[in-house]
């Protein structure tokens, strides 16, 4: 055994393994388009009023298959805007039955025009503008939220 594998280090390896096993997976959204394979999106969670108000403001880039998931305490008509947001986004409104009820496509950066869900929604997913068109995502598609830590109400 080389000097870099001291007995002390070997004692900590099981602890390191246990910590790694207990780490929670990255939150993600799975979208099931009516035509095509499931789409996996890694998400940041906006689950407080402060996080929901700030959203993706001031972000200059967003990797493909990444987004922000907004969690609301109840299902109701939601409205978004693009104030201080330099990226065009697709805003996907999802109801409590995990069905897409509306999509605001290729939103205009920095616009203060309200973009309402039109129908009650409890979750909202923001992804890059054009994402829904590129991946065939439509109103009526189903969604799953595995590994999403829901806040306690």
Residue ranges of model-derived segments:
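Residue-level signal for mature regions of secreted extracellular proteins and peptides
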Residues: 14-15
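Compact, glycine-rich, soluble single-domain proteins
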Residues: 22-153
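C-terminal motif of bacterial Sec signal peptides marking the signal peptidase cleavage site
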Residues: 18-20
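Bacterial N-terminal signal peptides that target proteins for export
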Residues: 1-10
